[in-house]
């Protein structure tokens, strides 16, 4: 495979080439939309499988709502829609027809819709239309619903996985009787995202809440996880919102409480998307090939027999049959408080006669399969195989009977090593400053913790002058308020340090 551009040479081109050579995705014939190839989609399926188990273990249920939403629904919550109104795709007609000369297909002007439909940019409005029918009493609450869906936002600047017109995501929309219960739900599910980030994505993000001026439209609180990419930028990888009664009032969703009084329902929402795949690529990969946390890799092990004749291959496959039987029952225990099930070890056998061993090795190193097991016929009598560890790049000879027993330790050590490396990278590139001159000097390649006076005006001034934004108020700083702290620009009182960074 061709050598890829290094991160130092051109970070953006490095990312694009890695996505292409690892056969994860490509641009499609539809502007801004991507084709997710089987290898890339397998990663999304693994993300989805893990998160879905987490959701169900926290008593959430899946549902499906329409892709097309009446435009009038969006007028009920105008402030919410303002965030993405310019990105909405609109359906105006319901039929095509042949032109009079039968040379082309045209839109039938007589098939104009009475009301235009919006291709789902997010589902709050259509879901709350259903909730109005579902909720009458406090006994109907809480509703804990998640949807796996595709979404359309007509992005002008697109980049595979990170920003595309169409993408896949999950969206939670929960309804509650009290504000306390709703906010507790928002925080609990942020913890689910944080657990997933650390234990499966092998990431060490900063966790906190957004400042008031940067909350999700209509939210009373927005919580977020913010990891650092290898180019020192932040990427908002997950958010959780407590929205109070705003949507309950907009859609007139009321319930009778325990005192037989009418109240508006409280609401929370949150989502993550295929953007996570871009996050994984940029967080762990190096200048040579893709690097993935083993727990989310499409395959954990690839087994490559080395043979000259069909007879050699048959002998090797017979030799390996006991291994296959054990591998079929092998599993990995994730250290997550939200996952009860083990993850089944996934393996692949490559006996393709059209590719040389060298080409196979190169392909699996680029795509990053954590362990490669190579089997020569000469090793049959010693009952051993060669194991290549993709993280350490070390080759060891291992007895066949010992291989499956060692798999879990090797793979989970790889997982933990990636997490510790990511955590060390973020901590080594995080700086605490007290003056604006120092801030401007460091912000290009650091996460910066600095005091802020709490005003949108100061945040906007910093963004205009440095392109850095407040990513979040970290949880540990939110509880460390001190009247003696001052903002680095205005010299007004500052209650806490906040995280500043440049971002995607």
Which functions belong to the PLM regions below?
Residues 1-504:
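NTP/phosphate- and nucleic-acid-binding module
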């Amino acid at each position: 495979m061709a050598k890829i551009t290094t991160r130092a040479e051109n970070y953006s081109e490095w990312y694009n080439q890695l996505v292409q050579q690892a056969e994860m995705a490509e641009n499609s014939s539809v502007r801004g939309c991507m084709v997710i190839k089987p290898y890339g989609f397998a990663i999304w399926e693994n993300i989805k499988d893990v998160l879905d188990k987490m959701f169900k273990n926290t008593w959430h249920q899946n549902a499906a709502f329409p892709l097309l939403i009446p435009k009038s629904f969006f007028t009920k919550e105008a402030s919410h829609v303002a965030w993405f109104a310019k990105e909405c795709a609109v359906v105006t007609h319901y039929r095509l027809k042949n032109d009079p000369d039968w040379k082309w297909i045209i839109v039938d002007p007589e098939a104009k819709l009475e009301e235009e439909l919006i291709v789902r940019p997010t589902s709050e409005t259509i879901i709350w239309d259903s909730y109005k029918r579902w909720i009458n009493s406090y006994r109907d609450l809480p509703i804990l619903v998640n949807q796996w869906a595709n979404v359309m936002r007509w992005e002008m600047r697109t980049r595979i996985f990170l920003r595309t017109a169409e993408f896949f995501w999950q969206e939670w929309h929960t309804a509650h009787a009290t504000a306390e219960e709703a906010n507790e739900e928002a925080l609990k599910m942020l913890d689910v995202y944080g657990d997933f980030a650390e234990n499966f994505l092998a990431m060490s993000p900063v966790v906190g809440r957004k400042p008031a001026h940067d909350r999700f439209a209509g939210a009373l609180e927005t919580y977020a996880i913010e990891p650092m990419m290898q180019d020192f930028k932040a990427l908002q990888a997950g958010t959780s919102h407590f929205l109070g009664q705003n949507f309950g009032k907009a859609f007139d969703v009321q319930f009778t409480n325990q005192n037989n009084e009418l109240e508006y329902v409280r609401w929370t929402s949150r989502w993550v998307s295929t953007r996570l795949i871009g996050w994984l690529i940029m967080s762990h990969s190096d200048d040579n090939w893709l690097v993935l946390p083993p727990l989310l890799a499409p395959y954990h092990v690839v087994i490559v027999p080395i043979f000259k004749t069909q007879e050699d291959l048959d002998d090797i496959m017979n030799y390996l049959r006991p291994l296959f039987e054990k591998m079929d029952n092998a599993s990995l225990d994730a250290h997550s408080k939200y996952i009860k099930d083990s993850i089944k070890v996934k393996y692949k056998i490559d006996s393709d006669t059209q590719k040389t061993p060298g080409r196979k090795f190169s392909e699996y190193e680029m795509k990053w399969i954590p362990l490669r097991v190579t089997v020569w016929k000469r090793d049959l009598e010693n009952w051993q195989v060669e194991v290549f560890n993709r993280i350490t790049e070390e080759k060891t000879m291992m007895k066949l009977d010992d291989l499956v027993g060692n798999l879990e330790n090797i793979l989970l050590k790889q997982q933990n090593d990636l997490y510790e490396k990511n955590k060390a990278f973020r901590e080594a590139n995080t700086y605490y400053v007290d003056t604006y001159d120092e801030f401007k000097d460091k912000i290009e390649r650091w996460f910066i913790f600095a005091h802020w006076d709490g005003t949108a005006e100061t945040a906007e001034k910093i963004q205009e002058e440095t392109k850095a934004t407040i990513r979040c108020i970290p949880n540990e700083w939110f509880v460390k308020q001190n009247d003696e702290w001052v903002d680095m620009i205005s010299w007004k009182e500052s209650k806490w340090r906040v995280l500043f960074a440049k971002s995607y």
